[in-house]
């Protein structure tokens, strides 16, 4: 490798290593450098079509941190917007808003501090945190885009394209940060690599084994996250274009939506269902494996029998409808 020391007048030096492990994350340049050297690395890249906006706050003196068990949640999905509070130390916290790229009016409004606060204060679950008498902002809103699901393949026809090089975590398989799986995937991937390196000294065997285990153990997590991205894009389009009424009805589509509504409602009210979902989120088991539990399956079925209307009501947090929020932002100076 040729190393450039940016802190020492860009002085260059060449070094050799037994192994190169790329753990540089979503901004990794290694795959580009390898391609420039003629290494064929295939890449799957899917745009989640969303953007995040974050603003940091600090609770005012004398204001206690709100309960995590309040009736109106501090994290939720209104359809046109997802939101969440992430507490820190000493009264500091971050508020993150996730918007579809197509929500141009909302995106424009929320870029300003006034617009960000005004929109968020229409959500009852956020008022205990950012009401005018609760907290003060410590930053302006700032955004992050280019949210892609990325999977890189280092084998071609079953043979490694580069030896003694291993990309781990986001450098190899990147998912939407909305699902909070990045750190868990990175940790799991590091353990996979450790096992591979311990079991063989042969560079070809190592490369093939690492690729196969990555596909076996990380692949299902990546695919589940990608499906959620696609579902989010579809739901956003339906809401924005009012395609719900135009959509052809089918038993399969009805069952899928009814099951999702029932699962979400059951997770809000039944702790053992919630724990099953958390196991999937934290990668303690394969995606959806908790649904093999007969008790959870019976519970979700009982919720389905209650009807979608009641289950949707439990899932959706209080907040303005999309038409109402668009009208609201038109009043912001």
Q: At which residue positions do the language-model features occur?
A:
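FAD/FMN-dependent oxidoreductases across multiple families
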Residues: 103-225
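A structural signal for short secondary-structure junctions
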Residues: 89, 159-160, 255-258
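Intrinsically disordered, low-complexity coil segments
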Residues: 6-12, 75-76, 157, 239-254
